[in-house]
């Protein structure tokens, strides 16, 4: 775990986002020590409208906040990624977070990502170049008022598959070269828009298997949907 943290730090990242469930507490200990900004995540696209689910969700939410509220690296509370929570329940959970962590009223923001209502902020995801879109417009898209922070960007690849250099192809072969070309373009264009955007989160540091898989039938996705990673590029 420590080696993973060191690799992330050595790669030049200055912020970390859980993907998409709570990680081991040693991660936040390291982020505290190294001054890395931490966007902690509680859940991902899950909802069952039963009293038992609601109560257990809030019980686990309280534990999550209690374990992390005194960590100086935490700057964002991520209630749910691609949220399916009803607005009223998300508001109830946000109020619970603010009750347990008064800094969430004035300093720390409560979020969903790529969908959701009832929190302070639904952070966008911009996967241009991966799921369609025009990657050459990335800097202009990030500069829009509703973008500000990109919660996810990334690229598909097939390990050890290489292609000849050339212009970027949106529907090209998922080679390592194409992945590098896309990632380099997005990093460069985000830097050009740095006065209009506060950051972007590359998805994802690691996953269980070859990241060249295709959804929805890749590997153990169906039985492993609750984590510790949800499979995306």
Residue ranges and their predicted role:
Residues 1-2:
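Short, small-residue-biased leader/transition segments that mark boundaries at the very start
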Residues 5-7, 15-232:
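Substrate-binding/catalytic cleft of secreted carbohydrate-active enzymes
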């Amino acid at each position: 775990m420590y080696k993973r943290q060191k690799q992330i730090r050595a790669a030049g990242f200055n912020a970390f986002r859980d993907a998409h469930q709570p990680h081991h507490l040693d991660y936040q200990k390291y982020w505290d020590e190294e001054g890395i900004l931490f966007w902690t995540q509680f859940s991902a696209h899950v909802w069952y409208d039963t009293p038992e689910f609601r109560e257990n969700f809030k019980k686990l939410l309280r534990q999550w906040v209690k374990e992390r509220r005194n960590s100086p690296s935490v700057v964002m509370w991520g209630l749910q990624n691609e949220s399916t929570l009803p607005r009223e329940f998300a508001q109830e959970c946000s109020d619970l977070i603010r009750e347990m962590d008064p800094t969430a009223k004035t300093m720390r923001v409560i979020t969903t990502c790529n969908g959701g209502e009832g929190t302070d902020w639904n952070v966008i995801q911009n996967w241009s170049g991966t799921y369609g879109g025009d990657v050459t417009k990335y800097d202009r898209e990030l500069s829009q008022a509703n973008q500000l922070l990109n919660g996810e960007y990334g690229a598909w690849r097939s390990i050890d598959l290489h292609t000849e250099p050339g212009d970027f192809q949106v529907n090209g072969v998922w080679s390592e070269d194409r992945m590098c070309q896309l990632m380099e373009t997005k990093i460069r264009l985000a830097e050009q828009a740095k006065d209009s955007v506060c950051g972007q989160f590359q998805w994802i540091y690691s996953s269980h298997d070859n990241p060249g898989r295709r959804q929805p039938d890749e590997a153990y996705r169906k039985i492993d949907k609750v984590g510790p990673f949800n499979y995306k590029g």
